[in-house]
Structures are given as structure tokens and as C-alpha cells.
Amino acid sequence: MYSSRAAGGVLALLTGAALLAGTTPASAVAADFPAGDEGYHTYAEVTTELQKAAANHPDIAVLSSVGKSFEGRELNLVKISDNAAADEGEPEVLFTCNQHAREHLTTEMCLHIVQRFTDGYASDPNIRSLVDDHVIWVIPNVNPDGAEYDISGADYKYWRKNRRPVDGDKIGTDLNRNWGYKWGCCDGSSTRPASETYRGPSAFSEPETQAVSRFVDSRAAGGQQRIKTHIDFHTYSELVLWPFGHTEDDTGEGMTAEENARFRDVGQRMAATNGYKAQQSSDLYVTDGDVNDWMWGTHKILSFTFEMYPTGPFPGFYPPDEDIARETTRNDAAVDILIREAR
């Protein structure tokens, strides 16, 4: 989620090189992460792991797709439930990762959620209870094109946006400024295609946000949205954030005092388990067209952003792969809290 505005001088130095690297459209397929970080999973490796989870646990896990990226990659979707082949009307939870290309630790977070709830179902009573009483949806790669581009070659590119060309020679829209609720309303995104926070030519202009939003829309039945809670994982800063991002007001249009109090309560309880700081999104900086505002403003889904490890720019977006296990399991208790809030 981190914008160039908030990141300060470090990202300012990197932005020029990243934008220059993005002026020539190309579909990148990464063989692996840069040397030393091979413990991270490429898009192909994530897909293989998801296929294994579904094959090894066919009763509780189903792998499908919500659609395709600009370059044609499947936006993989995993459903986890005690009877995954059926639609039983249980409360649903959604986890999304990797809206921003360079935030690879988030993909590992979603993969960890899938593996934890499938591998642990038979032996862990807590996991079994959560799976039996809910439907858990996981989208590990919302922006696979950008992620693959970011790791193509020998070095990281600090790439944030997707890879659809815009305005002739520029590439990419910030997917987390492209959602339809209050899109472009409040000086929380950019109209400049060269900007890291470029919001796109219109709300939902990008195939990735179109696909995920269509899926969420499809979970509404009989006037009721089945998805009750949601986390969108980002890096970095170690924060738990809730709506609204487009306004600094705690309450007002679309948010009652009671609703805000629930966001605050759940956010603080989750933060108490992982040591993150809990706050309203706009307390960090104002954003418009972000996923949390859309989830809540459109569907009344209790939607949070987790800004994962680390707290600062070193190692910033690229923590070493030996940190993956520690920083993903760090969020286990918070994930469980969010699932239990789906009711």
C-alpha cells in the first residue's frame, strides 16, 4: 500500500528507475527470485502449491479462478470449507494479496493461509472449527503480471502497478486506487500515468480489479452479501488499517459511530496479537479508490488492510526469505479473529 508520498526519500530515489524500466511493455516470466531469495514463490510456483493443496485435500479445498490478468494469467482463487464442493450458505471470509507487485511477502501470507487451513484441518481442533463453520476464500496474486515483472532478471525493479499500457508509452495502474467507491474523489490518487498512485482512466478500468470485484459482487444473494470480513495484505509498516481512506472523518456518510467502533475494536484486537499498530487508513494518508473503502462502502464487508513487516525501508519491500515463516505465522491469531468475526 505504501505510496511514494508516504515512503519519503528512499522511494523517491527508486521511482525514477522503476518508471524508466516500465516504459517498454513486455510480458515477463520469472524463472526465480533474485539470488538469495529463492525461498519466495514465483507465480508458477504458487500455482503449483495451490494445485497440490486442492489435490491433497479435495473435500475441503477447491482451486478455481476469478478471471485473468492483462497478460492472461489466471487470478487463482482457493475455496476452503468443510464441504467445499457445495454452497452451504455459511458466512464467508476473503483474503487478498499482492495488489502491489513488489509486495511479495503478501503472496507468501496468502499461501500460508491456504496451507495452514488445509494441512492443519485433520489435526488442529481450532482450524477444524473455523473451516467447518465458514467459507474461506483466498486470492494470493491479484497482480501477477506486475509481480513477475518485478522479479524478472537478476535484480528487483521496485515495481508497484499492473502492466497494462496507458497513455501511449507509460505502463501500469495502481490497482489499489482503481476501485469504484469514491474513485478519484479526494486527492488520494493521481491522474498522471507516470505516477505510482495513478488511478487509471476510470474506476475498474483494469482487468484485475474488474475480476475480483465481480467475484465479490457474485457472493451477494437475496440482498445479503455472504462475504462478511476481508483482509488485503500489503507491505510494509506493521499496521492494521480500516476504512475510510478517502476521508479523515471517523464517521459520516457510510459509517456510523457504532460501525466505526466495531472496526476499531476488531482492528485493535488483531493488532494485539501481532504487535502491529491499529488505526484508520486515512490517519496514515488519504487514499481514494482503495479496496477497503469499496468493500465496506459497497458491500458492508468488514475490510482491513494489513501492512506487514518490516516497519521501515530497510529491508522495506524485500525482506530476506528467511523471514517468511516468522512473519506469516505472526498473523495466525489475527487471521483467526477475522474469521470468527464473519457471522
What function would you assign to each model-found segment?
Residues 1-30:
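Secretory targeting and sorting signals
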Residues 3-8, 32-36, 189-343:
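C-terminal accessory segments enriched in acidic
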Residues 8, 28-74:
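Short glycine- and acidic-rich boundary segments immediately preceding or forming the N-terminal edge
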Residues 29-33, 47, 51-55, 79, ...:
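Soluble secreted/lumenal catalytic domains
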Residues 43, 47-51, 110-114, 172, ...:
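Extracytoplasmic/secreted envelope proteins and their assembly/folding machinery
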Residues 58-62, 73-75, 89-93, 132-137, ...:
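Loop/turn elements at helix/coil->beta-strand transitions in domains of secreted/extracellular proteins
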Residues 77-87, 98:
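Short beta-strand-to-loop junctions in surface cap/lid or active-site-entrance loops
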Residues 90, 104-108, 112-251, 312:
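Active-site/substrate-binding loop(s) of hydrolase catalytic cores
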